[in-house]
């Protein structure tokens, strides 16, 4: 387990989205139920070792490595009708948050371009399954956020919102 010794070992956890550092020696995963990001040392792949975890102030939905940083899509929504989220930049070696960037909606996933210069964040603003049996459309709609990166870090000036409404024949007002 990757939980600290003083944590309830029976608490629910889940290594949902997994990424690897550029050297391939460390796995980093989002743990939504525990509101944390975990690290696994795989320098010896036959003997992986827990390498710690960092608790967060929200639900991590996705992780992606950019250079020596890990980008964390963090759901901070107050409710389904008041979605919120941030993109965190964490130094991999020090496991410390360097930056937080408001995304304006509930992120679902993050991916980094092969050259490490752009992160794409899918803003889902997930629907409420209890409303109208979860049928779409449901406001607010989602979108794509493109973020310019410099050495793996988010640059506030380089944030671009790309609307996705109107692209689908089914529920064109809801890009979820």
Model-derived segments and spans:
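Short, conserved, GDST-rich strand-edge loop motifs in beta-rich repeat architectures
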Residues: 73-83, 122-142
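Beta-strand-rich domains and repeat architectures in extracellular enzymes and scaffolds
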Residues: 2-37
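Blade-loop segments of beta-propeller domains
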Residues: 44-77, 103-104
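Residue-level detector of Asp-centered blade-edge/turn motifs that repeat once per structural unit
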Residues: 22-24, 65-67, 112-116
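Surface-exposed loop and turn segments in beta-propeller and other repeat-based domains
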Residues: 1-9, 55-56, 151-176
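Beta-propeller blade signature
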Residues: 83-94, 136-152
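A short beta-strand motif characteristic of beta-propeller blades
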Residues: 1-10, 46-54, 96-101
